[in-house]
């Protein structure tokens, strides 16, 4: 018979007791009552927070948006095809956050910063909440530095400053995205990090934009965030906030950033879809009551920070699409009232061949000349006045048959000024050469050049200045003023080039 040794048994029991660890994991779980149209109704989840992330059995993630007495309304960030009635849902205890860092530059990602360009994972160590409060009044500084778009009409008449929010508004196919992309291309070498957010667009359109940025070397300082038309409404709703969060990370490091939201009409439509499916009461144009707050909390995050916080900035260019030029619709009026100005693109001007089709009469920048270099201020004031007078005279000239010489001269100059504001797509012009062309136009140097030859003349003049008078560009780049020496060089160049052009 085997002898039982009590000391051995007691040591084994003691060892077992010492190694025993009791860990209780408590999960806040619920049950799916119904699911469909990107919305799930969940029973349970008693301790869930507003906007908390929840996880379904199949791994689909959702956001708890409606916290009601007897159930929770969750919007799905996936197709949710394998979610069934009765399946369990787990609250994660986290609010939506995304990874941020330098590694994201040059990549194409979705609204949750997951790469969609096939170049592998993005390795970052930091993360930020998608929804974070905007900088307060004390943390801000007034907008004082220009953000050059490279588009003469904008930089001269509707200047944009670093930290400003400037709306780009117009009908479909009027060149809104082209203005935004040109602005991104013009930031090359300016130490500005750009974020392009595509909301509800065709995947082919986004691919085209990415190709343009890659071919022109702009992807080296740009992050593209895409929530395509085929993506769930929740991702289209989140994408702009993701863009703001990425830009905010760089802004708080003292860097300058530019964010393009293309376009906020689609985000509002995605939010409307979610709200109606969650049975929230509809308001004007069936949008929910908080659609103003949807955009204001996004655009208020754009700022120019004070020097104590590093002096970084985030400039926002939201895009809004109008229907038949109606800027008094709900979303356009909301965004106009939130932003610091708007660039209005007109389909009539676009069809008449004036591209970019900027309607200078309705467009405005509420920051104004604080966002211009001194050289541009010196020449732009006269341009605005002459174009305004030209628009009035043109309307009057349609009815009058015999016009006096002064009026004819003014109309002729106005036509030439219109020509110098025309610009091909994807070819931004440096500010020093914009100053030169406006100076030539407003001081009558183009009055004897045929209207159809003006575009060729100003393009040639820019090349002539670049090769024969490099000192002119150097003076404006360093002093930012059109001083006597620069003006003398410019006059010389115009006279010399004109002689060869008309010969």
From Swiss-Prot:
PROSITE patterns: ATPASE_ALPHA_BETA
Name the record gives this protein: ATP synthase subunit alpha
Reaction equation(s) it catalyzes: ATP + H2O + 4 H(+)(in) = ADP + phosphate + 5 H(+)(out)
Residues the entry annotates as binding ATP: 170-177
GO MF annotation, one: proton-transporting ATP synthase activity, rotational mechanism
Top EC class of this enzyme: translocase
One GO cellular component, as annotated: proton-transporting ATP synthase complex
Enzyme Commission number(s): 7.1.2.2
Family designation: Belongs to the ATPase alpha/beta chains family.
Activity regulation, free text: Inhibited by dicyclohexylcarbodiimide.
Keyword match Transport: yes
UniProt keyword annotation of Transcription regulation present: no
Membrane topology: Peripheral membrane protein
Subcellular location: Cellular thylakoid membrane
Temperature dependence as stated in the record: Optimum temperature is 55 degrees Celsius, activity was detected from 4 to 95 degrees Celsius.
Sorted UniProt keywords: ATP synthesis, ATP-binding, CF(1), Hydrogen ion transport, Ion transport, Membrane, Nucleotide-binding, Thylakoid, Translocase, Transport
Record site feature (Required for activity), residues: 363
Major localization listed first in the record, in broad terms: membrane
Function: Produces ATP from ADP in the presence of a proton gradient across the membrane. The alpha chain is a regulatory subunit.
Alphabetized InterPro entries for the sequence: ATP_synth_asu-like_sf (IPR023366), ATP_synth_asu_C (IPR000793), ATP_synth_asu_C_sf (IPR038376), ATP_synth_F1_a_nt-bd_dom (IPR033732), ATP_synth_F1_asu (IPR005294), ATPase_a/bsu_AS (IPR020003), ATPase_F1/V1/A1_a/bsu_N (IPR004100), ATPase_F1/V1/A1_a/bsu_N_sf (IPR036121)
Gene encoding the protein: atpA
Species this chain originates from: Thermosynechococcus vestitus (strain NIES-2133 / IAM M-273 / BP-1)
HAMAP family, per database record: ATP_synth_alpha_bact
Stored Gene3D superfamilies: 2.40.30.20, ATP synthase alpha/beta chain, C-terminal domain, P-loop containing nucleotide triphosphate hydrolases
Subunit-structure text: F-type ATPases have 2 components, CF(1) - the catalytic core - and CF(0) - the membrane proton channel. CF(1) has five subunits: alpha(3), beta(3), gamma(1), delta(1), epsilon(1). CF(0) has four main subunits: a(1), b(1), b'(1) and c(9-12).
């Amino acid at each position: 018979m085997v002898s039982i040794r009590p000391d051995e048994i007691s040591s084994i029991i003691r060892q077992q007791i010492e190694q025993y660890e009791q860990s209780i994991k408590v999960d806040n779980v619920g049950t799916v009552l119904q699911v469909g149209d990107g919305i799930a109704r969940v029973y349970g989840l008693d301790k869930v927070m507003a906007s908390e992330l929840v996880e379904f059995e199949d791994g689909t993630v959702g956001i708890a948006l409606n916290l009601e007495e007897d159930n929770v309304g969750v919007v799905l960030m996936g197709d949710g095809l394998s979610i069934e009635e009765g399946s369990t849902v787990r609250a994660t205890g986290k609010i939506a956050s995304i990874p941020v860092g330098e590694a994201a530059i040059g990549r194409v990602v979705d609204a949750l910063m997951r790469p969609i360009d096939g170049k592998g994972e993005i390795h970052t160590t930091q993360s930020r909440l998608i929804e974070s409060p905007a900088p307060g009044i004390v943390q801000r500084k007034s907008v004082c530095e220009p953000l050059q778009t490279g588009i003469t009409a904008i930089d001269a008449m509707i200047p944009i400053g670093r930290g400003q929010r400037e709306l780009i508004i117009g009908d479909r196919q009027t060149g809104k995205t082209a203005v935004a992309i040109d602005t991104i291309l013009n930031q090359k070498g300016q130490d500005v990090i750009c974020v392009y957010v595509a909301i509800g667009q065709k995947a082919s359109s986004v691919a085209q934009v990415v190709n343009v940025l890659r071919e022109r070397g702009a992807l080296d300082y740009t992050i593209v965030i895409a929530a395509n038309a085929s993506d769930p409404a929740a991702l289209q709703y989140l994408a702009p906030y993701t863009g703001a969060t990425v830009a905010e990370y760089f802004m708080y490091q003292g860097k300058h950033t530019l964010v393009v939201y293309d376009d906020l009409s689609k985000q509002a439509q995605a939010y409307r879809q979610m709200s109606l499916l969650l049975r929230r009461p509809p308001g004007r144009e069936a949008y929910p009551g908080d659609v103003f707050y949807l955009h204001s909390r996004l655009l208020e995050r754009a700022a120019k920070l004070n020097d104590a916080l590093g002096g970084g900035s985030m400039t926002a260019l939201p895009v809004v699409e109008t229907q038949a030029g109606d800027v008094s619709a709900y979303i356009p009026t909301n965004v106009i009232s939130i932003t610091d100005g708007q660039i209005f693109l007109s389909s009539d001007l676009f069809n008449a061949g004036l591209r970019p089709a900027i309607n200078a009469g309705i467009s405005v920048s509420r920051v104004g000349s604080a966002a211009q270099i001194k050289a541009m201020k010196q020449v732009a004031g006269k341009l605005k006045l002459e174009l305004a007078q030209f628009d009035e005279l043109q309307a009057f000239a349609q009815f009058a048959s015999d016009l006096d010489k002064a009026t004819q001269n003014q109309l002729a100059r106005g036509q030439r000024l219109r020509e110098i504001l025309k610009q091909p797509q994807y070819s931004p012009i440096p500010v020093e050469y914009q100053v030169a062309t406006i100076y030539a136009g407003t001081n009558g140097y183009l009055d004897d050049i045929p209207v159809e030859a003006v575009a060729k003349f100003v393009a040639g003049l820019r090349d002539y200045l670049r090769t024969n008078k490099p000192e002119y560009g150097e003076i404006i780049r360093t002093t930012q003023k059109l001083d006597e020496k620069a003006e003398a060089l410019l006059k010389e160049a115009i006279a010399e080039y004109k002689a060869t052009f008309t010969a």
